[in-house]
């Protein structure tokens, strides 16, 4: 139908900030015969709490089953990015490497996300940078934030396993 085709072509997908069409924009990645998804996803997701001004967005996210693991207490954007990467974006055996808030490692509000990762993925390693008071020791000198770097593989692990966690005294020396 030419009229419908004309309307579809008139839609400006770049202006729509409610969703991102991964399968459309990266069809070559998600429509491969041998595997779907990215082999590696690297990022520094934003750290911000969703506030009352984001009520509509929070409702939309809560209704998406892929993001339920990011909820629990206050919703921080970085948790949504992690959930999206581990549930939607990685190919089988793909690797996710993110740098994000160190509080994730012990935060009760991130329990669901940690449980999901431990059950469904393989943690290759975690580097923790707890220093935030000394500017020279921070990973990002201008940001007073403790961070960690996770390396997570989209691979099933059939039994308990050990993964290394390195705690760094500063950005150059681990303890």
Give the location of each predicted region.
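Basic, amphipathic N-terminal segments
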Residues: 1-17, 31, 35-36, 40
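Signature of N6-adenine DNA methyltransferases within the class I
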Residues: 20-24, 29-175
């Amino acid at each position: 139908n030419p009229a419908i085709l004309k309307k579809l072509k008139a839609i400006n997908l770049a202006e729509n900030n409610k969703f991102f069409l991964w399968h459309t924009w990266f069809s070559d990645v998600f429509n491969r015969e041998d595997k779907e998804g990215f082999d590696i996803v690297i990022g520094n997701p934003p750290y911000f709490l969703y506030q009352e001004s984001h009520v509509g967005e929070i409702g939309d996210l809560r209704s998406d089953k892929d993001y339920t693991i990011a909820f629990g207490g206050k919703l921080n954007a970085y948790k949504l990015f992690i959930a999206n990467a581990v549930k939607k974006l990685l190919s089988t055996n793909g690797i996710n490497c993110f740098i994000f808030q160190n509080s994730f490692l012990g935060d009760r509000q991130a329990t669901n996300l940690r449980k999901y990762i431990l059950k469904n993925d393989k943690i290759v390693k975690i580097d923790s940078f707890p220093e935030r008071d000394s500017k020279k020791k921070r990973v990002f000198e201008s940001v007073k934030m403790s961070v960690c770097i996770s390396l997570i593989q989209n691979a099933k692990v059939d039994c308990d396993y050990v993964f290394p966690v390195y705690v760094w005294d500063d950005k150059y020396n681990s303890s």
